């Protein structure tokens, strides 16, 4: 089962039409939609805004459902010049650009892990990339242009940049 989280209700609402055999459950002040997307069991949840809310929602879902992977989906800003609205970004590593636990740890270093960037799950990323490839091919066969898939680092933070 995959947990699909999003920080905005509109983002989860966009996924709901693809959910089959949906069942709503409630817990920790959140609504969890259980079902399947293309026969893959999933749980959809609006985590609310911020990393603490996302962590709390994920922790509750992980304690309640047989979650094997967590995917956070939704819109985001970008620093990459060739990224267009609708393009997909798949992480190979993740970091928090404004994490600062000095003087005990270097800027952006996750305390006690000795890492500034956390590696994404290569297995899940491969599955997502393969699914994108199948979808992009179907879009092209239907005469529609598919958004571009970009691979690379994804940063998060508490400061708005721009």
For the regions a protein language model found, what residue spans apply to each?
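N-terminal short beta-loop-beta anion/metal-coordinating cradle
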Residues: 1-59, 65
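A generic local secondary-structure boundary/capping motif
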Residues: 59-60, 77-80
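Mid-sequence, gly/pro-rich, charge-dense loop/helix-turn segments that line enzyme active sites
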Residues: 79-162
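Proline-aspartate-enriched helix->loop->beta-strand connector
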Residues: 66-71
């Amino acid at each position: 089962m995959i947990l699909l989280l999003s920080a905005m209700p509109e983002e989860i609402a966009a996924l709901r039409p693809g959910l089959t055999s949906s069942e709503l459950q409630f817990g920790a002040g959140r609504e969890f939609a259980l079902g399947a997307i293309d026969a893959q069991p999933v749980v959809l949840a609006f985590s609310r805004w911020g990393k603490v809310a996302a962590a709390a929602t994920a922790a509750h879902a992980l304690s309640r459902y047989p979650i094997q992977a967590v995917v956070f989906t939704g819109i985001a800003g970008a620093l990459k010049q060739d990224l267009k609205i609708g393009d997909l970004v798949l992480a190979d590593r993740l970091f928090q650009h404004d994490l600062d636990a000095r003087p005990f740890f270097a800027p952006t270093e996750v305390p006690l892990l000795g890492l500034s960037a956390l590696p994404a799950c290569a297995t899940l990323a491969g599955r997502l990339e393969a699914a994108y490839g199948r979808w992009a091919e179907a879009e092209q066969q239907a005469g529609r242009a598919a958004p571009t898939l970009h691979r690379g680092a994804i940063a998060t933070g508490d400061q708005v940049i721009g």
